[in-house]
Amino acid sequence: MNRKDKYYIRAKRENYRSRASYKIIEINNKYNIVSRGDNVLEFGSSPGGWTQVIENITQSVIIAVDINRMDPVKNTVFIKMNIFDDDIFKSIDHAMAENNIKNFDSILSDAMSRTSGIEDRDHYNSYKICERVMDISIPRLKNGGNIILKQFQGDMTNEFIKKWSGYFNYYKITKPKASRQHSREIYIIFLNRI
């Protein structure tokens, strides 16, 4: 982590766990993905930068999933699990039942595998994560709900969008200012589940 990075410095000053907090702040300010009272499912939650922002907005239950541990965040049920684990469906459904959640208003994914520096491999891995997130999410997202996913842009991005955009009224691609400029990282936003 570059300790001279302005978002890193700002995150430390404002008590956010990561510079990624500013990505979700910017995206939500622009697209109004989450609102007060929303129930949210979050993938790739550790260390909790997005979770802090989401909880501050929704002041409602968040179910957060990550393969890495995460320190507690208010109103958050944390599931430490790999999203490719067969039990992920059961674990999420159990957490939903325990918290009287029928469907989610919004589902957010900042999940990413470790990068290799090989662009095609990193893109493919991010594509597979996004596919898995969508497989988990579509049956659990309410009509009118929204999804955000991080992906390394590449030759399968258009195919991914074409496959899933039919479930929504519209989609957007964005790259927040807090994303590193040289990164191929983008956020795909699917809005208003049909």
From Swiss-Prot:
Record: active site: 150 (proton acceptor)
PANTHER family per UniProt: RIBOSOMAL RNA METHYLTRANSFERASE, RRNA METHYLTRANSFERASE 2, MITOCHONDRIAL
Organism: Picrophilus torridus (strain ATCC 700027 / DSM 9790 / JCM 10055 / NBRC 100828 / KAW 2/3)
Keyword DNA repair included in the entry's annotation: no
Gene Ontology MF term list: rRNA (uridine-2'-O-)-methyltransferase activity
HAMAP family linked: RNA_methyltr_E (MF_01547)
Entry keyword set: Cytoplasm, Methyltransferase, rRNA processing, S-adenosyl-L-methionine, Transferase
Domain of life (superkingdom): Archaea
Reactions performed catalytically: uridine(2552) in 23S rRNA + S-adenosyl-L-methionine = 2'-O-methyluridine(2552) in 23S rRNA + S-adenosyl-L-homocysteine + H(+)
Family the UniProt entry places it in: Belongs to the class I-like SAM-binding methyltransferase superfamily. RNA methyltransferase RlmE family.
Job description of the protein: Specifically methylates the uridine in position 2552 of 23S rRNA at the 2'-O position of the ribose in the fully assembled 50S ribosomal subunit.
Main localization of the protein described in the UniProt heading: cytoplasm
Location within or outside the cell: Cytoplasm
Protein name: Ribosomal RNA large subunit methyltransferase E
Record carries keyword rRNA processing: yes
Gene name tied to this protein: rlmE
GO cellular component, one term: cytoplasm
